[in-house]
Design a protein with these regions (language model features):
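Juxtamembrane extracytoplasmic/periplasmic/luminal helical "stalk" adjacent to the first N-terminal
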Residues: 1-4, 17-20, 132
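Short, solvent-exposed loop/turn and secondary-structure capping segments
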Residues: 33-38
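Charge-enriched interaction surfaces
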Residues: 39-41, 129
């Protein structure tokens, strides 16, 4: 029910900000104790052409991971590598691990914004060749309980390449 309740808001935010993707992953465990392959509930919605025209029925969007019941209730298409949950892989999950675990282990809890994290390098979701840069921050309850992350994805190529002035990014001394 919670994922269904937030799915339309995630789509709205993704469209409004012209993002390639948006996701929420729920977790209440110490990730240092989680083995690779551990699954966490969540949703990842992707738009391969955020600058292009979009369908009122969201036919231009796909779900990278989400429970099957959410796929049925939203009517969104599934990606070819769709999974019913997020599969944790420590070496490829900094977008989850760093903001979540840092907030979880903090002696003095700060605002979720203070734990925000941009990935340093693009990464790929399992069985998907498209690389993504991501920004994520932990989800924190008023009592300090850290229960997951919310984040955005930006396709690194060609979407970001078309947005960034590469001639201005060159370091020539």
């Amino acid at each position: 029910p919670l994922l269904r309740a937030i799915s339309s808001e995630l789509v709205f935010e993704m469209r409004a900000k012209k993002l390639s993707g948006i996701y929420v992953i729920f977790c209440s465990r110490d990730l240092d104790d989680c083995a690779d392959g551990t699954r966490f509930p969540g949703i990842y919605v992707r738009d391969l052409d955020p600058d292009g025209p979009y369908s009122d029925r969201n036919a231009d969007l796909s779900l990278e991971f989400a429970p099957a019941t959410l796929v049925q209730s939203t009517g969104l298409y599934t990606a070819s590598a769709w999974q019913p949950a997020f599969e944790y892989q420590r070496e490829a999950s900094d977008f989850l691990y760093l903001p979540y675990q840092t907030a979880r282990n903090a002696k003095t809890l700060l605002s979720a914004d203070d734990y925000g994290h941009w990935t340093r390098f693009p990464f790929c979701l399992p069985d998907d060749p498209r690389s993504v840069f991501s920004y994520s921050q932990p989800l924190i309850l008023p009592d300090g309980t850290v229960y997951g992350v919310v984040g955005i994805g930006l396709l690194s190529d060609p979407y970001l390449r078309g947005k960034l002035p590469t001639n201005e990014l060159q370091n020539e001394g």
